[in-house]
């Protein structure tokens, strides 16, 4: 089905750019229909001029159908006859026509059919009488609107029938006039950015100068890139050259009547192109019959059906000479299938054009206002330079304030505009189901990955081709997948929508918060196919806590990539069997679960893991292609690879515990890459390996390997196979038994053997060569492309390389005995890279050579080199760090391609040439040139300029450095000020002036709009707060003399980090600002600061240690995002508000050495917090659930430190003791009686009574008394606990917060340890538990308390919310109100008599535990109506 009114991909053109009709006739039917009008329409039809159907039903009011027809016509012909004004219909039509003339530039042609124009204008004569009759009973407003329209149209240029010799003559001229006007190119597209370039390019493909050719052309490109807009503009431009033309938009349809659909297509096209609405088609082929002799222009838009093309434009020969057919589609294969070879690809606009497009939509001009520049750049970037996105986003932001733009940015960054999504979604919906799946895989997991890598994982080649041909992905020249960021967002939105808000039901997870929820809550389902934690989220402040059964519900999971995150408190018992990718760096497992079979595994990547082995036995590894275990230091063995017949890459770099490879590696006949460098313990290789596909072998840094492996690489033992081979051998002293094919690498000989003839050798790497020269004479090295002789400290000369004409890379780093290079190096015309770093003996390079291809020259560390090297005029990157060069010659101006020049630490360099212009130079690094006092004018091309640690006294004029992005002037102590021309650096992003101790002030009245990073740390003379940019993100002012922060800091809306450490004069911060983006504030060491900073409530990390702050105020609860609060050594601090416990994200709060603290926290606050976090759980549910909830509540306090807080009152100390399940340190000299088992020294044994074996204790609390460290004594920054029972051993280290070396006196250190459920005493039936504590501090005492859980169920009464419980110990008795249900008590091993009373009645149950009598007081809190009492010990006596 065809839809000729479909909206374009880009709603840029005005409404006049989409005209459906050429002519709209307005007339009084009974006056002209059967005479004049019928003759006129016949003439128009003959010239293929389209007009509105005159059979539309007419009434007293104009309906929407006719109103639309008026607006969609290019010309309105108004036929004024005697009775025209008798029709209110006609008069209302005329009013609308006049509006379109005024507002839409519609052309109007009046025809005066036997009436006088002046009578129409003034409503006089017979025409006037008819008009007055019609106006009776009409409102005055309606009458006036008619009069105005009549008066306006009557004076327009038109046709008066009375002035023509015949009606036929006038009609013929009128028709020609209309034809000329409709064929005049429209200017509706003239204001579209870049449109003319597209039109001219397509016109050249169309070969319009050829009058005989019939040409079909395709316009192809991604959805939203503007294909249809370009097509409409092109159609408008070309229409004047074709009498017969049609613009048809395809619209997909469903149905089984294929024949009927084709006939409708033909009718639609012929009606459009011939201007006949009543065409009847009863058989196929009518298009060819009717248009065979006609020169036509046909443009088919948004085509997605080959059948559509075959039906309408089957062959170019169907049409007359000079015809042009243009097909617009997103599917390149469709064009190929229709044999359209001339294809114009619409590419993305440049960044400059994209910005202009955005600005046209948003601001109505070509560039943004100054204060919108950065925002406009970011929006254009978010739109990915896609015209659709640029237009829609620009329009949505048009007329909005800067604040609105800023508030909208997070939404634009994270989501997809609805209008954009609607357009892009069409492309997705048209895909086959399998191609839709492939689209989602790439959008959610694999955008930016290498094609071959993803093809192996997905086992799908067809899908890539389909998505590429439909412009949904692009394959880069180097073989990587590239999907537009808006399409990527579309895919992720589609996947998210299907899950209905439940991350566990999605197919793909790529967001840390979602992954964290699914993994920790174990809510993953069989729907889940892929989990990929993006690299930028690897280092989140929260760990990804993986449970042993986290992946159990994800039985269809195929792709798991969690990078450096994955904290596994206990072993993993399950991995999905369908995994194809397992990528888990730093994995804490010792081996993979025994249930994992690896049958589908394609890529196994576990770098930096704690693995000792992967698995036991032989697994079906037929799909495995890559195994990467590099730097798995504990790995002792590689599993049986007998069935890994498709393995191509094995990376074992740095596996320091690996001794050998299994002999089964010989089955990996497709192995291409084997890297075992730095396998320090590797002793032997399997013998007689036949790895015919091996191309790369690296055994460098394997000092214990004594026999070089005899590997058949290619055709034989002796010769290299044809092709490229690389052998890397370092520390070659062990190469005693090299096979014959490698004997030219025997580094024990004086030099390489004279029969050395490696004609096929492409790369020769002999790093660490022990002798003075490599070989004698000239060798035939015609295939050699790279040579590396680095670390060959005895090498005095390099061999003659005059025949190595293909050599591109020569690496001679750290060849300390080399003094010069031979002049024959001038023959290396293909040499691109020459590295001679740390060749300390090198004094000079040849001067009469010009290596025409040399782009990179690195002579860093050649400390004897005094002359500037000029061995190539095409150098791009030149590194001369730490050389003895004292002067740069003016001939450096010949290096027109030089992009980077590094001369760091050239201490003899004093001046630079002033009369050169390095037009390509972008990076200049002169850091550490301590004799350099002046600097010439900076060229326009410079982007990165580093002048750190120089003697420069002033900065030159910066007016031309308009492209400078990064400027470093650190430690330029002679600099006092900066030039005002710094204001010209509108592209400057980072500016550093650390330790410029002479700097007193920065220029004012400048706003560096792009500046994000400003570092003035150590500018100890700087007294005024710098306000040189309102867009700063990171601001460093450590150790400056600033005493006051102005309230204008509130303008820094993008400021994320403010660091003002050691600003000792700073006393107060403004209170009337709220920096909405500030996340990190560091005021540590501001010793005069007395008040808590209140400049932002969005802070996440707040550093206030060593300040004079006296109170943490109540409003701390407003800091809802706070995760870190450092206030140690605040000697004046006295009070900490209990509201600090309302901060649910707080993970670390350190008040060490706050010796004045008296009040800290509050019982009621903690209790309320815990009540909020523990929810009702059915009695039948595993008791561990309750403890997990308590554990998470305790996480709020897990990083609280009160070391050396000697004035803590009793309430605060008791609170810390009973509520913390994680490490805490505070002053103390003896183990509290709360700990039921105590002993002197560092160990104790707990005897578990037989009566307690039915109990479940899930954790213990421990406490040790430690002495402060002696001066000079080494220490471990952690406490280690060893627990032994029934032959099992637990070990736990507490390192993050147990900085015991900072303690000034004896301290208590509390910690908690959780047992695994399978090790409960009721399951293992053990009688005692041994505890051993280890610490660098001497441990004076230790204590332990076992934490028990008991369940009580009673089905008789469940509706009562308050009950009584009497706890008796010895002779003491206390009544406590308690809600009925689940009793959670950490009873220790005390003898407790419990009586559970229901209301005021008799006890319904009692429990008695035998043992020594011990009184314990408890505080009981109630979760109302949920049946969960929670008991907290108050004290032990």
Curated annotation (Swiss-Prot):
Keywords: Acetylation, ATP-binding, Cytoplasm, Endoplasmic reticulum, Hydrolase, Leucine-rich repeat, Microsome, NAD, Nucleotide-binding, Nucleus, Plant defense, Repeat
Active site feature: 93
BP-aspect Gene Ontology terms: defense response to bacterium; response to auxin; systemic acquired resistance, salicylic acid mediated signaling pathway
Positions where N-acetylmethionine occurs in the chain: 1
Similarity comment: Belongs to the disease resistance TIR-NB-LRR family.
Binding site for NAD(+): 28-33
Observed effect of gene inactivation: Impaired disease resistance responses.
Enzyme class (EC, first level): hydrolase
Main location: cytoplasm
InterPro entries: Apaf_helical, C-JID, Disease_R_plants, Leu-rich_rpt_3, LRR_dom_sf, NB-ARC, P-loop_NTPase, TIR_dom
Quaternary structure note: Homodimer. Interacts (via TIR domain) with TPR1. Interacts with EDS1. Interacts with SRFR1. Interacts with HSP90-3. Binds to MORC1/CRT1. Interacts with TRAF1B.
Protein name: Protein SUPPRESSOR OF npr1-1, CONSTITUTIVE 1
E.C. code: 3.2.2.6
Annotated SMART domains: TIR
Role played: Disease resistance protein of the TIR-NB-LRR-type. Part of the RPP5 locus that contains a cluster of several paralogous disease resistance (R) genes. Resistance proteins guard the plant against pathogens that contain an appropriate avirulence protein via an indirect interaction with this avirulence protein. That triggers a defense system including the hypersensitive response, which restricts the pathogen growth.
Effect seen on changing residue 561 to K: In snc1; constitutive disease resistance
Catalysis performed (reactions): NAD(+) + H2O = ADP-D-ribose + nicotinamide + H(+)
The keyword Acetylation is annotated on this UniProt entry: yes
Domain-level remarks: The TIR domain mediates NAD(+) hydrolase (NADase) activity. Self-association of TIR domains is required for NADase activity.
Stretches assigned to the TIR domain: 19-182
Gene3D superfamilies per the UniProt record, alphabetical: Helical domain of apoptotic protease-activating factors, P-loop containing nucleotide triphosphate hydrolases, Ribonuclease Inhibitor, Toll/interleukin-1 receptor homology (TIR) domain
UniProt note on tissues of expression: Expressed in guard cells and epidermal cells, but not detected in mesophyll cells.
Biological classification of the source: Eukaryota, Viridiplantae, Streptophyta, Embryophyta, Tracheophyta
Gene Ontology molecular function: any one: ADP binding
Other facts: A gain-of-function mutant in SNC1 resulting from a point mutation leads to a dwarf and curled-leaf phenotype and a constitutive disease resistance in the absence of cell death. The phenotypically unstable bal phenotype is caused by a duplication of the locus carrying SNC1 followed by a hypermutation of the gene.
Induction trigger: Up-regulated by salicylic acid and in mutants defective in RNA silencing. Down-regulated by high temperature. Repressed by ZED1 in the absence of pathogens in an ambient temperature-sensitive manner.
Location in the cell: Cytoplasm; Microsome; Nucleus
């Amino acid at each position: 089905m065809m839809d000729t009114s479909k909206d374009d991909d880009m709603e840029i053109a005005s409404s006049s750019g989409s005209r459906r009709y050429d002519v709209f006739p307005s007339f009084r039917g009974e006056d002209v229909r059967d005479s004049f009008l019928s003759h006129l329409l016949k003439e128009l039809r003959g010239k293929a001029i389209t007009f509105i159907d005159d059979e539309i039903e007419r009434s007293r009011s104009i309906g929407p159908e006719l109103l639309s027809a008026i607006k969609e016509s290019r010309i309105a012909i108004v036929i004024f006859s005697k009775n025209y004004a008798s029709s209110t219909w006609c008069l209302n039509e005329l009013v609308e026509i006049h509006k379109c003339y005024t507002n839409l530039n519609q052309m109007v042609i009046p025809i005066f059919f036997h009436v006088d124009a002046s009578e129409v204008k003034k409503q006089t004569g017979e025409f006037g009488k008819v008009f007055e009759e019609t106006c009776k009973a009409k409102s005055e407003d309606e009458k006036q609107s008619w009069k105005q329209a009549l008066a306006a149209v009557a004076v327009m240029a038109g046709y008066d029938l009375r002035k023509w010799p015949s009606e036929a003559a006038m009609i013929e001229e009128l028709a020609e006039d209309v034809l000329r006007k409709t064929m005049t190119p429209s200017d509706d597209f003239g204001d579209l950015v870049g449109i003319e370039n597209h039109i001219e390019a397509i016109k050249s493909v169309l070969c319009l100068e050829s009058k005989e050719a019939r040409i079909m052309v395709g316009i192809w490109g991604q959805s939203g890139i503007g294909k249809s807009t370009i097509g409409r503009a092109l159609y408008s431009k070309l229409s004047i050259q074709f009498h017969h033309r049609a613009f048809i938009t395809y619209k997909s349809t469903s149905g089984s009547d294929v024949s009927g659909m084709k006939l409708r297509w033909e009718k639609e096209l012929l009606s459009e192109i011939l201007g006949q609405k009543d065409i009847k088609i009863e058989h196929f082929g009518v298009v060819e019959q009717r248009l065979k002799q006609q020169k036509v222009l046909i443009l088919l838009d948004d085509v997605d059906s080959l059948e559509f093309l075959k039906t309408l434009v089957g062959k170019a020969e169907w049409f007359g000479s000079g015809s042009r057919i243009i097909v617009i589609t997103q599917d390149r294969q469709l064009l190929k299938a229709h044999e359209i070879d001339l294809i114009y690809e619409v590419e993305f606009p440049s960044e400059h054009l994209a910005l202009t497009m955005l600005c046209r939509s948003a601001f109505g001009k070509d560039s943004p206002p100054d204060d919108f520049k950065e925002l406009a750049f970011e929006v254009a970037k978010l739109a990915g330079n896609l015209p659709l996105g640029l237009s829609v986003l620009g329009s949505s932001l048009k007329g909005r304030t800067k604040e609105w733009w800023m508030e909208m940015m997070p939404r634009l960054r994270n989501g997809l505009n609805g209008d954009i999504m609607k357009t892009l979604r069409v492309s997705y919906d048209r895909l086959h189901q399998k191609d839709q799946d492939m689209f989602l895989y790439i959008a959610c997991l694999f955008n930016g990955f290498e094609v071959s890598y993803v093809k192996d994982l997905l086992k799908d080649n067809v899908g890539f081709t389909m998505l590429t041909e439909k412009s949904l992905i692009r394959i880069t020249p180097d073989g990587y997948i590239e999907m537009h960021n808006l399409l990527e967002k579309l895919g992720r939105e589609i996947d998210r929508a299907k899950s209905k808000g439940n991350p566990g039901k999605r197919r793909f997870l790529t967001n840390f918060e979602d992954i964290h929820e699914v993994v920790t809550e174990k809510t993953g389902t069989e729907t889940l196919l892929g989990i990929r934690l993006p690299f930028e989220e690897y280092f989140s402040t929260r760990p990804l806590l993986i449970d042993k059964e986290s992946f159990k519900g994800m039985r269809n999971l195929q792709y798991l990539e969690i990078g450096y995150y994955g904290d596994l408190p206990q072993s993993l018992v399950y991995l999905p069997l369908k995994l194809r990718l397992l990528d888990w760096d730093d994995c804490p497992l010792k081996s993979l679960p025994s249930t994992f079979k690896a049958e589908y595994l394609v890529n196994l990547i576990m770098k930096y893991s704690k693995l000792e082995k992967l698995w036991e036995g032989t697994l079906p590894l037929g799909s495995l292609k890559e195994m990467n275990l590099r730097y798995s230091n504990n790995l002792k063995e590689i599993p049986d690879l007998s069935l890994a017949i498709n393995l191509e890459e094995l990376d074992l770099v740095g596996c320091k515990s690996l001794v050998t490879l299994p002999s089964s590696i010989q089955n990996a006949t497709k192995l291409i890459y084997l890297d075992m460098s730095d396998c320090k313990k590797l002793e032997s290789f399997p013998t007689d390996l036949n790895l015919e596909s091996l191309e790369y072998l690296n055994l460098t840094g394997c000092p214990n390997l004594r026999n070089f492996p005899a590997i058949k690489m290619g055709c034989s033992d002796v010769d290299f196979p044809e092709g490229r081979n690389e052998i890397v051998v370092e520390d070659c002293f062990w190469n005693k038994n090299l096979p014959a094919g490698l004997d030219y690498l025997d580094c024990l000989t004086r030099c390489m053997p004279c029969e050395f003839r490696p004609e096929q050798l492409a790369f020769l790497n002999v790093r660490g060569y022990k002798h003075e020269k490599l070989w004698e004479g000239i060798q035939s090295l015609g295939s050699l492309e790279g040579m590396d002789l680095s670390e060959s400290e005895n090498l005095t000369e390099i061999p003659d390389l005059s025949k190595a004409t293909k050599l591109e890379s020569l690496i001679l780093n750290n060849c300390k005995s080399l003094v010069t290079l031979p002049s024959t190096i001038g023959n290396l015309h293909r040499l691109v890279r020459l590295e001679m770093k740390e060749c300390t003996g090198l004094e000079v390079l040849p001067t009469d050579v010009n290596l025409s291809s040399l782009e990179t020259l690195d002579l860093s560390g050649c400390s004897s080199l005094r002359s500037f090297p000029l061995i190539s005029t095409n150098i791009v990157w030149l590194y001369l760090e730490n050389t003895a060069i004292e002067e740069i010659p003016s001939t450096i101006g010949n290096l027109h391609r030089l992009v980077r020049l590094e001369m760091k630490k050239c201490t003899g360099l004093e001046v630079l040439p002033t009369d050169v212009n390095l037009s390509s130079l972008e990076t200049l690094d002169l850091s550490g040139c301590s004799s350099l006092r002046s600097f010439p004018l900076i060229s326009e091309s410079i982007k990165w300029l580093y002048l750190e640690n120089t003697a420069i006294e002033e900065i030159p004029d910066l007016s031309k450095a308009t492209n400078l992005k990064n400027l470093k002037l650190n430690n330029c102590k002679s600099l006092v000020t900066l030039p005002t021309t710094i204001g010209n650096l509108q592209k400057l992003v980072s500016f550093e002036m650390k330790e410029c101790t002479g700097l007193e002030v920065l220029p004012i009245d400048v706003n560096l709009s792009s500046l994000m990073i400003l570092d003035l740390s150590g500018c100890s003379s700087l007294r005024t707060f710098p306000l040189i940019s309102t867009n700063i993100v990171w601001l460093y002012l450590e150790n400056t003399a600033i005493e006051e922060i102005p309230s204008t800091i509130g303008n820094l809306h993008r400021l994320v980090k403010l660091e003002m450490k050691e600003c000792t004069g700073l006393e107060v911060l403004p209170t009337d600002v709220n920096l909405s983006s500030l996340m990190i504030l560091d005021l540590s060491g501001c010793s005069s600061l007395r008040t808590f900073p209140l400049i932002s409530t969005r802070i996440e990390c707040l550093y206030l240690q060593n300040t004079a702050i006296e109170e943490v105020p109540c409003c701390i609860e407003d800091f809802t995002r706070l995760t870190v609060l450092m206030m140690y050594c605040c000697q004046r601090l006295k009070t900490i508000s209990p509201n600090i416990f309302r901060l649910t994200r707080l993970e670390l709060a350190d008040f060490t050495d706050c010796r004045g603290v008296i009040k800290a926290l509050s019982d009621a606050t903690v209790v309320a917090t815990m009540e909020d976090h523990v929810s009702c759980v059915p009695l039948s549910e595993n008791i561990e659930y309750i403890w997990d909830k308590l554990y998470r509540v305790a996480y709020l306090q897990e990083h609280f430190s009160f070391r050396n807080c000697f004035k803590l009152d009793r309430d605060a100390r008791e609170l810390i003791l009973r509520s913390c399940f994680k490490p805490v340190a505070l002053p103390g000299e003896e183990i509290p009686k709360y700990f039921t088992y105590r002993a002197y020294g560092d160990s104790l044994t707990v005897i578990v009574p037989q009566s307690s074996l039915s109990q479940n204790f899930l954790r213990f609390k421990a406490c040790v008394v430690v002495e402060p460290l002696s001066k000079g004594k080494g220490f471990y920054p952690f406490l280690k606990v060893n627990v032994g029972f029934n032959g099992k051993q637990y070990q736990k280290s507490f390192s993050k917060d147990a900085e015991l070396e900072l303690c000034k006196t004896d301290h208590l250190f509390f910690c908690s340890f959780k047992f695994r459920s399978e090790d409960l005493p009721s399951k293992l039936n053990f009688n005692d538990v041994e505890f051993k504590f280890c610490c660098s501090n001497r441990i004076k005492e230790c204590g332990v308390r076992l934490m028990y859980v008991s369940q009580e169920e009673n089905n008789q009464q469940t509706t009562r919310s308050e009950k009584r419980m009497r706890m008796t110990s010895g002779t003491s008795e206390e009544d406590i109100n308690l809600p009925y249900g689940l009793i959670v008590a950490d009873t220790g091993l005390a003898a407790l008599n419990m009586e559970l009373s229901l209301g005021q009645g008799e006890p319904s149950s009692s429990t008695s535990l035998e043992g020594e009598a011990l009184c314990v007081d408890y505080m009981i809190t109630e979760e109302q109506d949920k049946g969960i009492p929670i008991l907290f010990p108050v004290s032990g006596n």
